């Protein structure tokens, strides 16, 4: 199955427009969103932008009902009452309400969680390590994969609100024992990168995040990954900063192993 990966949103409604174009063009069969829907630089008072972004996410969820959603640290910070950089106390009640609306728009409540698996690809915001599983429950190291994911998704907030968890881990900078890298590819966001790249079977995709002045940090691209082989295509899209007035998605495809 070809899965389009939608990286961190951070109040950028146009990312859903680009994703929709890729799906409509038949480049992918379904999508997985790595979320972090709320918060961005100096946006605490822009309540309407929060609302518009969640409404766009909800519309996308309805239009593409097979989409999977992976909570990010900025998402859970609101219902969990954990302050995060960029947290907006002014948007708090609306964000919590919109998350409930998003969850209720899904075909199944299991479509939104910390981690998901499609065949041989694992999706989470930050990535899963063997070290985290040892801390959570060492028996999980030898458990069936669906039992592992269920245990992660059912873990307490204290376990998950931790730098080593799939909400927070940064494989781009931290050296840890990755979970079954010879068996599964992982796709993550969370940490802004200049280029989409793979390291120890973890593919980093957060290229749309910005500097404090609004400039995009990374390239304008998303990936479509084959859920069985783990091979992926990088699809270039028109970034918001490149052309505010042009809603077209210009596509070029490069194949990676």
Model-predicted segments: where are they?
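Beta-strand-turn-beta hairpins that frame and shape the catalytic cleft
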Residues: 1-4, 116-123, 199-201
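Core catalytic region of metal-dependent phosphoesterases/phosphodiesterases
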Residues: 6, 11-102
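Active-site-proximal loop/helix segment associated with metal-binding centers of metalloenzymes
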Residues: 90-101, 112-181
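Short, solvent-exposed aromatic-acidic interface loops
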Residues: 234-246
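A short C-terminal boundary segment appended to hydrolase-like catalytic domains
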Residues: 243-257
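Conserved beta-sheet core of the metallophosphoesterase superfamily
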Residues: 172-236
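Short hydrophobic beta-strand that contains or immediately precedes a catalytic carboxylate
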Residues: 5-6, 71, 123-124, 188, ...
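Active-site environment of divalent metal-dependent phosphoester hydrolases
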Residues: 10-17, 39-42, 74-81, 129-131, ...
């Amino acid at each position: 199955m070809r899965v389009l990966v939608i990286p961190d949103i951070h109040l950028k409604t146009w990312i859903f427009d680009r994703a929709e174009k890729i799906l409509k063009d038949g480049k992918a069969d379904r999508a997985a969103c790595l979320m972090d829907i709320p918060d961005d630089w100096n946006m605490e008072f822009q309540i309407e932008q929060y609302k518009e972004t969640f409404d766009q996410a909800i519309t996308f969820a309805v239009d593409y009902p097979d989409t999977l959603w992976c909570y990010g640290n900025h998402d859970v910070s609101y219902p969990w009452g954990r302050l995060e950089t960029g947290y907006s106390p002014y948007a708090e009640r609306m964000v919590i309400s919109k998350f409930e609306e998003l969850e209720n728009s899904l075909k199944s409540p299991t479509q939104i969680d910390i981690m998901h698996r499609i065949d041989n690809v694992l999706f989470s915001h930050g990535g899963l390590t063997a070290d985290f599983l040892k801390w959570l429950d060492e028996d999980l190291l030898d458990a069936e994969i669906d039992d592992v994911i269920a245990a992660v998704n059912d873990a307490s907030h204290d376990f998950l609100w931790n730098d080593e968890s799939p909400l927070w881990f940064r494989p781009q900078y931290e050296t840890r024992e990755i979970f079954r890298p010879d068996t599964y590819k992982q796709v993550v966001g969370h940490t802004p990168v200049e280029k989409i790249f793979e390291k120890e079977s973890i593919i980093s995709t957060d290229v749309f995040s910005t500097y404090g002045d609004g400039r995009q940090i990374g390239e304008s691209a998303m990936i479509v990954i084959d859920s069985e082989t783990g091979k992926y295509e990088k699809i270039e899209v028109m970034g918001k900063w490149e052309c505010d007035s042009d809603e077209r998605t210009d596509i070029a495809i490069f194949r990676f192993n």
